[in-house]
From Swiss-Prot:
Belongs to the isocitrate and isopropylmalate dehydrogenases family. LeuB type 1 subfamily. NAD(+) binds at residues 76-89, 282-294. The lineage of its organism: Bacteria, Bacillati, Bacillota, Bacilli, Bacillales. One of its GO terms (biological process) is L-leucine biosynthetic process. Homodimer. This is 3-isopropylmalate dehydrogenase. The gene is leuB. Its cofactor is Mg(2+); Mn(2+). One of its GO terms (molecular function) is 3-isopropylmalate dehydrogenase activity. It catalyses: (2R,3S)-3-isopropylmalate + NAD(+) = 4-methyl-2-oxopentanoate + CO2 + NADH. InterPro entries: IsoCit/isopropylmalate_DH_CS, IsoPropMal-DH-like_dom, Isopropylmalate_DH.
Amino acid sequence: MKKRIALLPGDGIGPEVLESATDVLKSVAERFNHEFEFEYGLIGGAAIDEHHNPLPEETVAACKNADAILLGAVGGPKWDQNPSELRPEKGLLSIRKQLDLFANLRPVKVFESLSDASPLKKEYIDNVDFVIVRELTGGLYFGQPSKRYVNTEGEQEAVDTLFYKRTEIERVIREGFKMAAARKGKVTSVDKANVLESSRLWREVAEDVAQEFPDVKLEHMLVDNAAMQLIYAPNQFDVVVTENMFGDILSDEASMLTGSLGMLPSASLSSSGLHLFEPVHGSAPDIAGKGMANPFAAILSAAMLLRTSFGLEEEAKAVEDAVNKVLASGKRTRDLARSEEFSSTQAITEEVKAAIMSENTISNV
């Protein structure tokens, strides 16, 4: 198989973890006899510094010319005082909008060998395996008007708009039901229908879409209760589907069940089939260039890319099995280590690559 992958390193530790993921993809290509071509593009602060634009047209063109996109991380305090249109995060929001990346998938799974890294007791996180499906291109982050101004009495005011079309809600909820139908058959739709009109519409649409999936159970949950239930009984969930801001907050909360943001991959899906994959963690500029970054989330994002964009199930599982093998051996990055001893980003990457190349599967026995 020959495929083209757009690589967007971004800022902070983004280039380091993306290099790890790329090296792993090269090992997969070697072992399974594929050909992956890579094209780099700038995004976020790196693009602002070079082009005075968080998402240059060249980057968009490179993405549209690719079969899949792999991103590192964006942001950092260096650009915190920039106007909103010149903030690194604007690049991420813009690429989501331009490529119509409407649904973000965040798998939350606790690795057995990392159960001691979770802040929750083991009995609370046993069998935790769910996916948060977050709407990405609507809601409070994109609604208009969104501005600050001075009113007629000279006082500063600000307004943001939570706006959704029925079609925007419908397609992301349907994606959640499709996933649940292939998993454990349960969708938890999270909203704030006791207060917000947009959430009342969300709940109505969820009920309508549920009629298409008679074998999938639908439950509604208010967002404040969902935040509590993620800690109280996280193993009750299968697929959680919610709007943009709620999903942003809940997915970060859920990430701590695993013990580190550095373990969680994500995928952003488009209706065209051009999907973007990225680790959930941020750019962590304080450890950039020190070899301390955890590459597992980026590597697992590459596994999601292989499975979701290319349909390469065996190859994706080889990567995931390699990660499991390295973790089971006791190797830890700094964020996961329970002592002063830890492995560097590069050392972990080499361990994963070696595990991929050494595994015996039907295809290469």
